[in-house]
Amino acid sequence: QAYEEMWVAMLASFAKHLKEKGWFDICTIAMDERPMDVMQKTLKVIRKADPDFKVSLAGNYHAEIEPDLYDYCIVIGQNYPEDVRLRRKAENKRTTYYTCCTEAHPNTFTFSDPAEAAWMSFYSSKKHLDGYLRWAYNSWPLEPLLDSRFRSWAGGDTYLVYPGARSCIRFERLIE
């Protein structure tokens, strides 16, 4: 109860601030990889604060919450039902896909075939999606030029470019 009250008050104040600045229409409250029951509770809190907040989720596909999401990004290997994809397009909602450390292929790890990065856009186009989400751009481990691993994650999962304005073949092929 107290937790919900705090979030509703903060989000309502945030919405007011965004509207005063003219930024509300370009703001999206985003979450990643949350279970459906958590998302349902979260959406209730957000809607109490302001029913017009745009909400984004990168995670599994859940038909039950799909209509409430302005920007929906599902993991590769899952599919949007065709009628849902078409309705979302008609409603000007973003509909994308992503990869993360759990997909060995295709991906953009330091050991991935560079062609996999170029393939990402082709896949998005084939599926008639709005694009591809790469979860991290420059979240470097301690010594990214010497070791691309972060904890137990695959090498390069946490970044696509190197410090000091250095690009990499993975990034160059992704934007190709």
Indicate where each model-derived feature is located.
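Catalytic-core regions of glycoside hydrolase
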Residues: 1-146
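Predominantly late transmembrane helices and immediately cytosolic-facing juxtamembrane segments
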Residues: 139, 144-176
